[in-house]
Each structure stands twice: as structure tokens, then as C-alpha cells.
Amino acid sequence: VTAGPDGATPLDAVDEVPVWLEVNGQPAVTWMCTPDQLDALVVGWCYGEGYIEHRDDLLSMRPCARELGFWVTVPEARYATVEGEERRRVLASGCGAVTTILGALHKVPRRATTPAIPDLTQTRTLFKALFARGERYQSTGGIHAAALTDGVELLNHA
């Protein structure tokens, strides 16, 4: 890829490869993603899907030695609850859609607390901080990124 600041500097293209996950021995998802910070991706996805609520719910997480994939074990009751919901996973690739869940929304478990809605000005500040930290974003002009915030500052960046 040629797109450096001078218009001629060669830049490395961002890798995007398949990464699979099995939960309790069953295939759960395959992502197309940059192969960085995959352990954080796995934990975050398991949390977002409801397989884990706390650190102790992640009984084990093993990476595959031969290819990009992980085996995760969670408590059987949590696994059964998620799998028993009326959901149909649709794997999609591209910006904004990796896994889309179709099904009965009333069956999706709700969090115990409702997060606060951040201030718009503070949200803009946090997004600017997110993009400022992205080395690949700076060199390519665009790449997927994520951050964890407490609403005041960025706590972690990927």
C-alpha cells in the first residue's frame, strides 16, 4: 500500500485473518480481525454475549497452537442460559458487523445496572484521545479501534 504522508511511502497493509472461538466445546464464532490482543477480544465477546459476567465465570481459556483460535470453558449453567435463548447468529464481515444476533430481544439477559449516558463534549474528547493513541490509525488514516473508558479518561486502548 502506498499512502504515506508524502504520497509515496510504502505502508504495510493491516492484516485481517480468521480467528475462531469454541465455548464449552462448541463452535461459537469466527471473526475476521487483526490478530492483536486476541485474548481481550475473546474475553470481551464472551462478556458481551452473556457467557461470563465476572472474571470467575471464565473457567479456562486456551489458545490453539496451530492456528488462530481459542477454547473457552464457562460454567455450564451460564452456557445453557445463553444457548437456550431464541437467537440465530449471522456471521458478517465488514465495518460495524461481525456477529448479529436475531431473535427474541426479551430473552436477552439484562445487566443489573444501567450505564450512565456520557456527556457529548466528553465523548468527543474521548474519541479524539482514542484516535491519537492509534499508531496504525496515524499511519494509514483509518483502522478499527476500541477503548475502555470510565467516562472521564481512556483506561485501555486496542
Protein language model annotation of sequence segments:
Residues 1-151, 156-157:
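Intrinsically disordered, low-complexity regions enriched in acidic/Ser/Thr/Pro/Gln residues
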